[in-house]
């Protein structure tokens, strides 16, 4: 009788332990253990940009590289210089300096790239705004952690930026935390599986493509195939979201949030376009006494005030990081209370 009772008990304990170990292994495999993945070997492996060769020169900007003044805290934007000045005045504004690059604590200028960074105070949060003007979209780039594509392969934004020689960088979409969803970097198609629409951890939003001509184009994976993206000439594709601004209009509301994130505000990272080869990279601090972090609607509102016609939300929270000229610009907040830089899968950067 004793043996009869003990045997089922042992079986139950053994089964429970095995099930627990299997569950732990599954969680580690998905969220912790780094796994390098191979690029798909099919006709979609790399986008062929030769079809755009004759148009590439049209993507360049003929205008001199200079930066518009960002709005002050009260939202007013100083007037742009008029065309009524003397010839000497005009030359003083547009003629390039003799020695490049010119670097200050919050700016960078050379023959092809101009960057100015300002910190704006809005909605109880600090917005670190980098305004970028390029003479070619080729200087808007991405990089992968440890120069490797895979799951849970991570490296700090600053470490990735230093490795690739970035002038300015922010974290990307943290593609490596997910097993599905489009991933295109530098014209290479690393992943072409569709993101699930029923993910309980994160809501389904549009992706963002950066095309060969530097245009930011939001799109839906369900209605846009990899073949479509190849025809469009997609250089980069990010899968986080949501789209904040489309065609100059804010497309989020007070109830829009990323999965289970705090609806009252979070650290944020966003990319926006103001015009041809004219961009914003924005990181907003959050989860601190100094800066609560904006809602998605507040983030979109600030970007619209700055003139964005297209804007997209990248990975935020503890990942939200901005790097410029060898230093961190913002205060990354990990685990809700630690000012500490998190390791991430990828970055968006300006550089050569």
List where the protein language model places each region.
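Zymogen propeptides
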Residues: 2-201, 207
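Active-site-adjacent helix-turn-beta-strand microarchitecture at beta-sheet edges
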Residues: 79, 98, 104, 108, ...
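Short, glycine-/Ser/Thr-/acidic-enriched flexible segments
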Residues: 122, 135-137, 175, 223, ...
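Beta-strand-turn-beta hairpins that frame and shape the catalytic cleft
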Residues: 125, 137, 214-215, 273-280
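Structural recognition of the beta-strand scaffold that forms the well-ordered cores
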Residues: 131, 167-171, 209, 217, ...
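Short, solvent-exposed aromatic-acidic interface loops
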Residues: 144-150, 223-226, 284-288
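Conserved, well-ordered active-site substructure
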Residues: 180-198, 202, 255-309, 319-352
